[in-house]
């Protein structure tokens, strides 16, 4: 990791989400009044309650938009996209859904923990999913998965109903990020490759037909091992952690934004989004440009 970015003392998750949304609206040339739903995927919310999405809806003037937050840890953006697709497919009144992945983990780090302080960073990325009549493009397949037996292996455990804020919680630093046990290194590679194969099989395509892969950016070796296991060239996978650090729910839309701006993605090409995070939560989706 050559560089990473943290919120200032006066910045918070809603600030990151707001700017990402403004960028997405400008790029898509869509008015705030045309957004029907705002979904914010984050495990570092503005508050426990109300939702971060409600704060941003007011700031952006999304006068016609419903809002809610989603917390599936670092798999959040893929989960939020899947929810957005389902809303669009199920209800004709949802035509433009603004989806954001955001991360302000610097607020929860222990300064003396060198394993986390050097890795985690802050950021946000947004995309707009739109209802279209053309059925051969856009969303194709998705799959969600949870391995709940790992729920107590890593996370932020203080400050909610199980361990409310009190003297003991603060003394134990339970309100900050903790890695209780080490996640098996091969687990991501195994589950990522299995889920990707499954959604490609559903679509009746080969994994090698997919031109672009956007993974959770937690470990470049996990990405490379997965690409090797799939028999796909490594260069098809976006890697941005060296430039931005690990940005949780934000890393996949940030990587997508970088590839879109560099004109790497062509019409008719397949994209896979593969997210994973604490819980353990996993989400995979297949789109066609």
Regions found by a protein language model. Name each.
Residues 47-61, 99-105, 165-169, 222-233:
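Acidic-glycine-rich active-site phosphate/pyrophosphate-binding loop
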Residues 33-41, 207-216:
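Short glycine-rich phosphate-binding loop at a beta-alpha junction
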Residues 3, 34-39, 58-71, 106-111, ...:
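Glycine/charged-rich beta-loop-alpha catalytic/anionic-binding loops adjacent to active sites
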Residues 81-150, 256-289:
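Conserved beta-strand-centric core segments of catalytic alpha/beta enzyme folds
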Residues 14, 18-21, 25, 44-45, ...:
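Claisen-condensing/thiolase-fold acyl-transfer catalytic domains that form or cleave C-C bonds
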Residues 1-10, 113-186, 194, 289:
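Condensing-enzyme catalytic core mediating Claisen C-C bond formation in acyl metabolism
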């Amino acid at each position: 990791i050559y560089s990473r970015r943290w919120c200032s003392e006066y910045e918070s998750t809603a600030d990151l989400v707001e700017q990402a949304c403004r960028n997405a609206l400008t790029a898509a040339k869509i008015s705030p009044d045309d957004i029907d739903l705002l979904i914010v995927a984050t495990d570092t919310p503005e508050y426990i309650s109300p939702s971060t999405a409600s704060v941003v809806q007011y700031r952006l003037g999304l006068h016609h938009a419903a809002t809610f937050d989603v917390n599936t840890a670092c798999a959040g953006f893929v989960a939020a996209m899947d929810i957005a697709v389902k809303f669009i497919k199920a209800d004709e009144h949802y035509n433009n859904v603004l989806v954001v992945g955001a991360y302000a983990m610097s607020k929860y780090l222990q300064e003396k923990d060198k394993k986390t302080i050097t890795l985690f960073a802050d950021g946000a990325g947004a995309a707009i999913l739109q209802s279209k009549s053309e059925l051969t493009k856009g969303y194709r397949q998705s799959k969600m998965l949870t391995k709940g037996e790992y729920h107590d292996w890593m996370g932020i455990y203080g400050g909610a109903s199980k361990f409310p804020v009190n003297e003991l919680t603060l003394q134990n630093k339970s309100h900050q990020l903790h890695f209780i046990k080490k996640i098996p290194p091969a687990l991501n590679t195994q589950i990522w490759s299995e889920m990707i194969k499954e959604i490609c099989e559903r679509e009746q395509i080969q994994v090698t037909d997919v031109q672009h892969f956007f993974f959770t950016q937690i470990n470049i070796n996990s990405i490379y091992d997965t690409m090797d296991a799939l028999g796909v060239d490594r260069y098809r996978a976006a890697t941005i952690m060296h430039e931005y650090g690990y940005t949780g729910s934000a890393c996949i839309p940030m990587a997508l934004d970088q590839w879109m701006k560099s004109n790497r993605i062509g019409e008719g090409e397949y994209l896979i989004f593969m997210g994973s995070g604490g819980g353990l939560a996993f989400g995979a989706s297949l789109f066609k440009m």
